Structures are given as structure tokens and as C-alpha cells.
């Protein structure tokens, strides 16, 4: 019997990975670079510090990582405000099923907590989960 479910937020609950990819591609052009699909796959879901190291390895040690991250976040939020954050198909139905069957559920993410809360809010999922890890 299933006692609990742990959802990965990015790519399972919300379609944030597609939004991140678009924003990253747009932001990197400001620095005269392009981002390959291979790079995007390599950095998907990794912790922030590992992401920063990957940027330096890919684009050089003088690459302005923090400025790029600020540009990237700005583009992500601009797109979310304009278009919303898509929720993956079936999420609401699955949550309803879990509630009806008294199965506890939580959300996991490699995002920092503040960003995760904002993304869940943008997807109308804030407050739905008892725990976040």
C-alpha cells in the first residue's frame, strides 16, 4: 500500500524546465554565446553551485555568472507573468486521488526555497503540499 508520494516539482508538476530552457537561451545571447541542447541537459536539475561551475567551464572563467543568473531569472519571471506557469497534465487529478485515498504527498526541488514557493504560486499550487524538500 502506498503511504506517501514525493513529487519532483520541475518537469513533473510544472513545466518549468521548458521555461528555464527558453530563458537561458535568451539570456545567453546577451553575452554573445549560444547554449546547446547538450548543455541544457547536463545542467538540468543540478544544484546552483554546480550550475555556476558548469557555466564557467562552458563559457570561460571570466563569464559573469551572477549577472547571467539575474538576467535569466528576470526573463523567467517576465515570461511567467505574461504567460503563467504551465501545470503538467493530470497533476490536479492525481492530487485529488491522493487526498480521497488519504495518501500524504510532498514536493521536492533543487531550486532554492524562495524560488520554489514563487513557482508553485505561479502555477496555483502554493499551499497544496504539506512539505517541501
What are these regions (language model features)?
Residues 84-86, 106, 112-133:
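Substrate-recognition "cap/lid" segment bordering the active-site pocket of phosphatases
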Amino acid at each position: 500500500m502506498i503511504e506517501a508520494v514525493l513529487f519532483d516539482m520541475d518537469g513533473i508538476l510544472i513545466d518549468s524546465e521548458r521555461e528555464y530552457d527558453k530563458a537561458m537561451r535568451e539570456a545567453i545571447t546577451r553575452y554573445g554565446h549560444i547554449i546547446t541542447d547538450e548543455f541544457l541537459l547536463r545542467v538540468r536539475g543540478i544544484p546552483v553551485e554546480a550550475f555556476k561551475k558548469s557555466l564557467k567551464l562552458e563559457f570561460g572563467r571570466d563569464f559573469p555568472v551572477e549577472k547571467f543568473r539575474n538576467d535569466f531569472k528576470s526573463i523567467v519571471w517576465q515570461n511567467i507573468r505574461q504567460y503563467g506557469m504551465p501545470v503538467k497534465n493530470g497533476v490536479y487529478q492525481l492530487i485529488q486521488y491522493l487526498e480521497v485515498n488519504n495518501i500524504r504527498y510532498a514536493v521536492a526541488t533543487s531550486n532554492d526555497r524562495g524560488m520554489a514557493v514563487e513557482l508553485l504560486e505561479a502555477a496555483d499550487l502554493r499551499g497544496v503540499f504539506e512539505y517541501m524538500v
